[in-house]
Amino acid sequence: MKKVLLLLAVLLFGAGSMMAQQDKSAEKAAKQAEKEAKKAEKAAKKAAEDAESNALFEQAVQALKDRDFVLEAERVEFKRGSFAYVTPSTNFVSMKGNKATIQLAFNGSFSGPNGIGGITVDGNASNVEMKTDKKGNITFSMMVQGVGVSASVNFRMPKGTNKCTATVSPNFNSNRMSFVGNLYPSEQSNVYKGRSL
């Protein structure tokens, strides 16, 4: 009788262990399937973002070639590393044909010469050059001459995105500044231009 009870106890214990292992392996397989689904979803989302970013890049490159673009700045960087976050609709560098506009407007109580808190200068663009390096990054440069401006403007746009930096370097002083933001074709831009000098 003792042997039968001992044998029965061993069988029940062994069956319980097997069931626990089966439950663990089923749980492990479910977790692995969930992990694979999340990984596939993340890869699809990244591919969609990359496709959208590349489309914006191609659009921006064509706008540079057509000389019909606007760089809407989200941030303005000054000479010694200080910077300010700004409103993209009122801070921009644009070009349409051979005419260029540079506008800087801060959010404050002072209206400035352009009526919106800063300065707007128009000028004629010359010495326009566009280059693509071996990695596909774009550089675009021009000289802007006008009533209130005489400066060189250099754009840098990395491959695969329409994020761009335009550095404005005045010819008569060293107070350069950089506009950092997104570059769009003029018809897709939503900027407000103040009074120019």
Question: Language-model features: where?
Answer:
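Bacterial Sec-dependent N-terminal signal peptides
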Residues: M1-A26
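Sec-dependent signal peptide cleavage junction
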Residues: M18-A63, V70
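Helix-rich interaction surfaces within compact, conserved domain-sized segments
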Residues: S25-K28, N127-L197
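N-terminal post-signal-peptidase region of extra-cytosolic proteins
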Residues: A55-L56, A73-S89
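Well-ordered beta-strand positions
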Residues: A63, S94, T101, R156-P158
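Extended beta-sheet lipid-handling architectures
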Residues: L64-D66, L71-A73, P88, M95
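Solvent-exposed coil/turn segments that connect beta secondary-structure elements
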Residues: E74-V76, K96-N98, A105-N107, Q145, ...
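Mid-length scaffold segments of soluble, non-membrane domains
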Residues: F83-N137
